[in-house]
Amino acid sequence: NFLGTLVNLAKKIL
């Protein structure tokens, strides 16, 4: 899931 990966990356950055 691309969207899930994007959210996961955002959570790691934030």
From Swiss-Prot:
Where does this protein come from, organism-wise?
A: Rana cascadae (Cascades frog)
> Cytoplasm among the record's keywords?
no
Keywords in UniProt for this one?
Answer: Amidation, Amphibian defense peptide, Antibiotic, Antimicrobial, Immunity, Innate immunity, Membrane, Secreted, Target cell membrane, Target membrane
**Role, per record:** Antimicrobial peptide. Has activity against the Gram-positive bacterium S.aureus (MIC=16 uM) and the Gram-negative bacterium E.coli (MIC=64 uM). Has a moderate hemolytic activity (LC(50)=50 uM).
Organism ancestry: Eukaryota, Metazoa, Chordata, Craniata, Vertebrata
GO CC aspect terms: extracellular region; membrane; other organism cell membrane
- Leucine amide is carried by which residues? 14
Family, as annotated: Belongs to the frog skin active peptide (FSAP) family. Temporin subfamily.
Q: Which domain of life is it from?
A: Eukaryota
Q: In which tissues is it expressed?
A: Expressed by the skin glands.
Q: Which GO biological-process labels does this protein carry?
A: defense response to bacterium; innate immune response
Which ranges does the record mark as transmembrane? none
Kindly provide the name given to this protein in its UniProt entry.
Temporin-1CSd
Q: Could you tell me where this protein is found in the cell?
A: Secreted; Target cell membrane
